[in-house]
Amino acid sequence: MSVVGSFEQLERLRDLFYKLLDLRDTLRERGVAWPKPLSEEAALGTVRVKVGFPAMLKRGVIMDVTNVEQAQIAEDAGAVGVMVLDKLPYDVRRAGGVARMADLKVIEEVMAHVTIPVSAKVRIGHYYEAFLLEQVGVDLIDESEVLTPVDEQHHINKWMFTVPFVNGARELCEALRRISEGASMIRSKGEAGTGNVAEAVKHFKSIYGAIKSLAAGDEERVRDFARQCQVPFELVALTAKLQRLPVITFAAGGIATPADAALMMWLGADGVFVGSGIFKSQDPRERAEAIVLATAHWDDPETVVEAQKMVSERGAMMGIDIRTLKPEELLQTRGV
């Protein structure tokens, strides 16, 4: 499987990307159109581009939003992207019924009003929701267990699309299966809509614990694991060699405070998704800024202290103890 050779190369690609964005904004201010040949000749859909784009989001926060106002708050707070939904995961859990892709009109409105990347969720196995999002022009598609799956046994073949996909995973086999299907980015599933980061912690420790075990083993151990997971040997071998997943890996599921975000970064996340934790809180602007600060500077305790002081526990979303949920109420078990 072809992947970008090194994360140093991805860092340079990210720097180039931001320079191009600055140039684009300067040209817009001067009333000059963006040179057409650059957009026409872009290598859309290649593995290098699809894996490279998420790498530009490292140390960043992608926030769930349901409208333009929330998207603008996220952008002002420093989010590296927004994820457009019809309902926030907390509300999806409360509402029940069938959760589907957000309205295309809302997605287009958000795209028209912010300059950061715009993502949206599709139901597991729903090819046509993904086709529609690709046609609309989103930057990233999340094949998400938060929405009601249309196929309990099969995920989307993501190699068919030019848009990069992100998928959730609870353990290493699940993550590698999604990558073998073409996922350009992995996130922990956690337990969305609970404001409880415990499951995300469990999933990250499971994934990286298994990788550490593989890295300490021999080739036969890698082959056995590949057979067990039903994924290519080369993918498992690459993961063992890198001692991490070969794609960008974000934390998601229950992140509600700056300390939660810093914890997940400390456990090895490249960045975080925040779902209900911001816009189901009483202080969304301050909390968004604080989580962005803590994520970007997780390895500087003084800055994380500063970020944590920006919010109050009294303003946090009301969390749900996962131990009180019935098995059929768990979202993380959707997908295989």
Curated annotation (Swiss-Prot):
Residues at which D-ribose 5-phosphate binds: D64, G193, G254, G275, S276
Protein's name according to its UniProt entry: Pyridoxal 5'-phosphate synthase subunit PdxS
Pathway per the UniProt entry: Cofactor biosynthesis; pyridoxal 5'-phosphate biosynthesis
Gene Ontology biological-process entries: amino acid metabolic process; pyridoxal phosphate biosynthetic process; pyridoxine biosynthetic process
Summary of subunit composition and partner proteins: In the presence of PdxT, forms a dodecamer of heterodimers.
Domain of life: Archaea
A Pfam family annotated for this UniProt entry: SOR_SNZ
Family: Belongs to the PdxS/SNZ family.
Tagged with keyword Lyase: yes
Task performed by this protein: Catalyzes the formation of pyridoxal 5'-phosphate from ribose 5-phosphate (RBP), glyceraldehyde 3-phosphate (G3P) and ammonia. The ammonia is provided by the PdxT subunit. Can also use ribulose 5-phosphate and dihydroxyacetone phosphate as substrates, resulting from enzyme-catalyzed isomerization of RBP and G3P, respectively.
GO MF terms, alphabetically ordered: amine-lyase activity; pyridoxal 5'-phosphate synthase (glutamine hydrolysing) activity
HAMAP family: PdxS (MF_01824)
Active site: K121 (schiff-base intermediate with d-ribose 5-phosphate)
Keyword entries, A-Z: Lyase, Pyridoxal phosphate, Schiff base
Keyword Mitochondrion included in the entry's annotation: no
Reaction(s) the record says it catalyses: aldehydo-D-ribose 5-phosphate + D-glyceraldehyde 3-phosphate + L-glutamine = pyridoxal 5'-phosphate + L-glutamate + phosphate + 3 H2O + H(+)
Organism listed in the record: Pyrobaculum aerophilum (strain ATCC 51768 / DSM 7523 / JCM 9630 / CIP 104966 / NBRC 100827 / IM2)
Binding site for D-glyceraldehyde 3-phosphate: K205
UniProt EC number: 4.3.3.6
